[in-house]
Amino acid sequence: MKNKHITPARRTSLELLNKILVSNKPFEKIILSSKKFLSLDDKDKRFTRLIITTVLRKFGQIDFIINQFIKKGSIKKNNLKNIIRIGIAELIFIKSAKYAAINEAVETTKINYSNRLSKFTNAVLRNIDRDKEKLSSMITDEMNYPSWLIEDWKQTWGTKQTKEIINYFQKEPYLDISVAGDPQEMEKVVKGKIIYNKTLRIDEIINPSKLPFYQTENSNYHWWVQDVAASIPAQLLINSDKIKIVDLCAAPGGKTIQLLKANKKVISVDVSNERIKILEQNLRRLNL
C-alpha cells in the first residue's frame, strides 16, 4: 500500500525516531545519514526536526500520558508506540491541528500494521485530546529526566537553580552566531542581539541559510553558527602566539572558523565523515 496519506515530514520523523531509540547513536549522525531526511525540502526538514526533538525533549511526559490510557507493557510493538508518541507530541506540545495529528497517526498505523490497530491508535489519541487540559496540569518538566539526575542537580545547585536548568533545557535552543565584522552593524542586519563580544543571538527559529549574507564575498559580513559558550575557549587562544591548535570534535566548525579568522593555524578533527563534510561546506562558504 502506498503511504500517500502521510506527509513526508511525519513519515520521516517516525523512521528516524525508531532508529534513534534503538540504535544508541547520536541524533545528528542519524539525521545526516538519512537520505530521506536530506531529500526533504527546508520546510519539511524543520517540521521533522521539531517532531523528533519534541518527542525526545518531552519523552518522560509523553510516556506518562500514554500510561494513563494504556497499561504498561500492553504495546508490544515499539513502532506503534512511537506513532502514538508523535501524535501526543503534536497534540499537547506542538499544537498541531487535531485532525492532521490524529488522522496521520491513524493512517500510519494502518499502513504499518492493520485496520484494527489503527482504530486503537485513533481511540487513544482522541481520548488524550479530549483530556489534554487535565493532562497538561498533571505533567511536569522534571518527568523528562531521571530522578537520580534531578537529585544530583538539587544537591549541587539547589532546588531553585535546578528548576531554572530544567526550564532552560526544555526550551527550543536559541540560534547564536559569531560575526567577523562589527557586531553592532550586524545586529541591525540580521535582527539579532549582541549577548557577548562578537556573538549575536537570533530569537526567531529560522534556517540559518535564510539569514542575510549567508553567501557573500565581503568578509566584513561573514558570520557562522556558534553557541556563545563555544566561542569562549577559542577567544582565550586568540591572543596566544606560537601555539599549535587541534580542534577535536570540530564539526560544524565554529571554533575552527573563529581561530582561522584570527589567522591561527588549526588542525580540525571529527569522528563523523558526515559532519566533516558540513565543516568543509562551512569553510568553503566563508572562503577559508
Task: Give the ranges of each region predicted by the language model.
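S-adenosylmethionine
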Residues: M1-L288
